[in-house]
């Protein structure tokens, strides 16, 4: 029953309307996605596959989470959804912890991102798995090429790399190095991993993790997108005449009936 309630609360957070939240850009992004048929369809698919928590060995976890299926649905969302809307959900700016927690939960971290253990593994583990993966390796290389500062410089970023940096960062979601927001008090992002247990390879481990946690090019690209988000959403949704909340209430009610 506890897992059902957890899944129900997550569903409300993911698909909830502005009546449950104070106005903020993450709510605006969610409503814009709901008003777009393609975005809403793909979003509903990943929500349905990502409820619950991950379990060891790829087995279905509490609430029905199968991480491989969840991550596949997330890759479809970013590959096939309107980029202006998918990126608005991913990079919406927040000023308070409630907004930041909504943003952190948007892509179902309990299934797609963290665990199944309580302690994150060494970053060398997902990095090595990514380097052996035909799916993950080219995406990570693209992220490094488009988002990493130039060698020997902390601040010199690839020319005109902002939009491409965001695109290739989003391409990592749904891979073995899926990044997410780490908490609800900052905008720090990283894969689910650390470097405390990396032994004599700690420097290599930290270099990988800092691609996310201390990357001025990625931070700058996210901040630039946030400054443009209102006009981006206005352009994307111009002319839409969808009801603001009827889709949300109907979908949420049906899903809750199935869970309870």
UniProtKB/Swiss-Prot annotation:
Keywords: Cell membrane, Glycoprotein, GPI-anchor, Lipoprotein, Membrane, Receptor, Secreted, Signal. The keyword Cell membrane applies. GO terms for biological process: cell surface receptor protein tyrosine kinase signaling pathway; glial cell-derived neurotrophic factor receptor signaling pathway; negative regulation of ossification; ossification. Residues 238-260 form a propeptide. The keyword Metal-binding does not apply. Residues 1-23 form the signal peptide. SMART domains: GDNF. GO terms for cellular component: extracellular region; plasma membrane; side of membrane. Coiled coil: none annotated. Gene3D superfamilies: GDNF binding domain. Interacts with ARTN ligand and RET: forms a 2:2:2 ternary complex composed of ARTN ligand, GFRA3 and RET receptor. Interacts with SORL1. Belongs to the GDNFR family. This is GDNF family receptor alpha-4.
């Amino acid at each position: 029953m506890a897992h059902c309630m957890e899944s129900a609360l997550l569903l409300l957070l993911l698909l909830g309307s502005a009546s449950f939240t104070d106005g903020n850009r993450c709510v605006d992004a969610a409503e814009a996605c709901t008003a777009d048929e393609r975005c809403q369809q793909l979003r509903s698919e990943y929500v349905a596959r990502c409820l619950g928590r991950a379990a060891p060995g790829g087995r279905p976890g509490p609430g029905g989470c199968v991480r491989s299926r969840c991550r596949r649905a997330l890759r479809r969302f970013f590959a096939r959804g309107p980029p202006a809307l998918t990126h608005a959900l991913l990079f919406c700016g927040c000023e308070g912890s409630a907004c930041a927690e909504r943003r952190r939960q948007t892509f179902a971290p309990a299934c797609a991102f963290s665990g199944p253990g309580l302690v994150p593994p060494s970053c060398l583990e997902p990095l090595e798995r990514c380097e052996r993966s035909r799916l993950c390796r080219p995406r990570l290389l693209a992220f490094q090429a488009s988002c990493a500062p130039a060698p020997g410089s902390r601040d010199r970023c690839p020319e005109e790399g902002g939009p491409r940096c965001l695109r290739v960062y989003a391409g990592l979601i749904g891979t073995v190095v899926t990044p997410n927001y780490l908490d609800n008090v900052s905008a720090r992002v990283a894969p689910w991993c650390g470097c405390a247990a990396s032994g004599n390879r700690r420097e290599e481990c930290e270099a990988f993790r800092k691609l996310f946690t201390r990357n001025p090019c990625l931070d700058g690209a996210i901040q630039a997108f946030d400054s443009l988000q209102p006009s981006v959403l206005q352009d994307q949704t111009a002319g839409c005449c969808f009801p603001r909340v009827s889709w949300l209430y109907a979908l949420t009610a049906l899903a809750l009936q199935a869970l309870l």
